[in-house]
Amino acid sequence: MTDQEFLDLAERLLLAVEQDCDRINDETDADLDAQRVGGMVTLVFANRSQIVINQQKPLHEIWLAAKAGGFHYRYDAAQGAWLDTKGAGEFFANLSRYATEQSGLALQFSAR
């Protein structure tokens, strides 16, 4: 994968996260704040806990930091998904789980 291909895929992922935050705020009482700075999105929940998602261009990875830990994801073209580098699942499924754990509400994130 070229750097530009990575950046395009990573941008789609971050945009999907931001759009899901808007949808979640419209549909629930989650009061979820998505703060975007360059290649990083910080999700801030009503209880002030955070999840940080950022691009790691040199490694062609997306990193996710949550209370549950730090996780690295690489894009798998065959599956069309961002997968944990240690085999712990797909990015959006994991983000949904970690956001639910941290917010105390059932929150769902998905790829576009």
Curated annotation (Swiss-Prot):
GO molecular function: ferric iron binding; ferrous iron binding
Single GO biological process annotation from the record: iron-sulfur cluster assembly
Keywords: Iron, Metal-binding
Cellular component terms per the entry's GO annotation: cytosol
Domain of life: Bacteria
Listed SUPFAM superfamilies: Frataxin/Nqo15-like
Family: Belongs to the frataxin family.
Role this protein plays: Involved in iron-sulfur (Fe-S) cluster assembly. May act as a regulator of Fe-S biogenesis.
Protein's name in the database: Iron-sulfur cluster assembly protein CyaY
Lineage start: Bacteria, Pseudomonadati, Pseudomonadota, Betaproteobacteria, Burkholderiales
Gene: cyaY
